[in-house]
Amino acid sequence: QGKNLTQAMGATNFISTIKGKSENTLTSTPDEELLKMLRDKLSKDSFETNIRLVVSAENKIRSESIFLEMANSFVQFSSNKTNSFKLVRTKKGAFDELIYKYSFRLFDESQKNVLGIEELTSIFHFPTPLTKTPNISGVKSKVSAPPTNIPKEGLLLGYNIYREEKKDIYIKKDDRRRHMYIIGQTGTGKSSLLSSMALQDIKNGEGIGMLDPHGDLIDDILSKMPEERIEDIVLFDPTNLERSIGLNMLEYDPRFPEQKTFIVNEMINILDKLYDLRQTGGPMFEQYARNALMLLMDDPNEIYTLMEIPKVLADDNFRKRLLSKCKNFLVKEFWEKQAEQAGGEGALRNMVPYITSKFDNFISNDYMRSIIGQTKSTFNFREIIDSKKVFLVNLSKGRLGELNSSLLGLIITSKLSLAAFSRVDIPEDQRNDFYLYMDEFQNFATNTISTVLSEARKYRLSLIISHQFIAQLPEGIRDAVFGNVGTIASFRVGAEDAKFLEKEFEPIFNSQDLMNIDNFNFYIKMMIDGQTSKPFNIKTYPPKKGDYKLANDIKEYYSLTYARSRYIIDEEIRRRRVDI
């Protein structure tokens, strides 16, 4: 299907024409199918082309026969509704000119045809990777021009080159508040983009949090840390066996007693995320765990930790002492009239190992015990957000194990969300922006992420979340992400993900493009001034080299200044368990 195709052999040409269309037909109500075809063609790259056929043979009869076979092959492109090709005889005087233009590949404006990529590949079959054709370079994936209203300033994501015009691509602060989702296979450049974005925020004086399940991203950021922001660093590195940072999940702000309910609900969600409570827990587990947590948090004089959960269940004296100070009548009623009175399989003594087994993995682990066993967290999450700190969290699964890494990440995500929501006590226009980067975020997301994504904007908590493939996400989290995220970026993905993402990027890009885009390139559907843009492509700038001695110096300084000796912490935990 072409606009105006001319072909030649000797004195013979092709032209394209619309056949059999009366004036009434062309001016009547538009054909929906035809309009769809027009829109489809206009949405893709097109090229001005000349197409010429030249045949050389041992005699005229043979050359004419070959030519007619070639000419007849264009009949397949004819359509009653769209363009067709028609054979036209060329005058003798034009023959030499035609051969000359063919020989030197000279473009003839008078015979140009506007053909789309699909039309060109239907007429001429380009070489495949299996075809040995020298001096031919191929394009594995399409490119597209950025929108005309692309911001001139903001956070730099990379650059776009379209028809030899290079343009830097920025995203505005307000558009970032609608969150950003990044997907791509390992090694495609996601970490490079995250590092670039985070370092720009740091240099601009913004507050950021970075949850890194591998540790490499944290090292990269520390190695490039601006000198003026070193004092703003809050480094959480649980992989240090000698010195520990404290993180108490049960700690809350007394000014906001409603936080207790949020913490308990999040703790249940975290356990469900880690153990799939539908299969391994059930309503009895949730009931006992919920009331044990509420009982510990209702003591007005003491701060407890997850270490005391087994003691609530197994130590009658300890539980009775807590109940004597408990003001929550529902919690008291559960323990005094249900749990302690139950018999048979539901008896409290039978429930103890059932409940505590879910906590033993953390309590008995050398890495975890000295972190979650401290009554006071080393840092204040609200202060981290309000004071624009650089909060870096090394959750290396290789050192901690996947379960412990996930638990700490889930607790920290919950704490940051709670701190952000507590900013209801200050006017919205006085809330500082805080950017939370989460690599492999599926490890740190519970079902409440839909609430975070929908509500965090007003509290100035902006999420940048990334992972490798969609199957990592439970259906509820997947729907929450694609239903609430404003900006979607896709590096190269596999076949299944390409099919899923195609609907986000069509008609500009298809699944083949998503599967074949080069490393350090990505497709993006970006939020611009509160509106979703048409998809286009971006290439990231190459990362600069860092100073890893600086990174190690920062880690050592922070460990000596803020972390505590594990020996001292273990001794405190031992004494506390004896005293209570």
Tell me the role of every PLM-derived stretch.
Residues L156-K166, K173-D175, M180, Q185-T186, ...:
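P-loop NTPase motor domains
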Residues T49-S56, I208-M210, I488-F491:
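Short cationic amphipathic helices and targeting signals
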Residues G20, K41-R163, S364-D366, N519:
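An aromatic-glycine-centered, glycine-rich loop/turn in mixed alpha/beta architecture
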Residues R39-F47, S196-D201, R478-V481:
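Short, flexible, solvent-exposed loop/turn segments with mixed acidic/basic and small polar residues
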Residues Q1-M37:
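Structural signature for extended repeat/solenoid scaffolds and their inter-repeat hinge/linker regions
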Residues T532, G546-I580:
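C-terminal anchoring/interaction modules
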Residues S73-N80, R105, S110-L115, S223-M225, ...:
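Conserved ATP-driven motor cores of ASCE-family P-loop NTPases powering translocation/secretion/packaging/pilus
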Residues S28-K41, T188-S196, S377, L473:
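Short amphipathic beta-strand starts and helix->beta connectors
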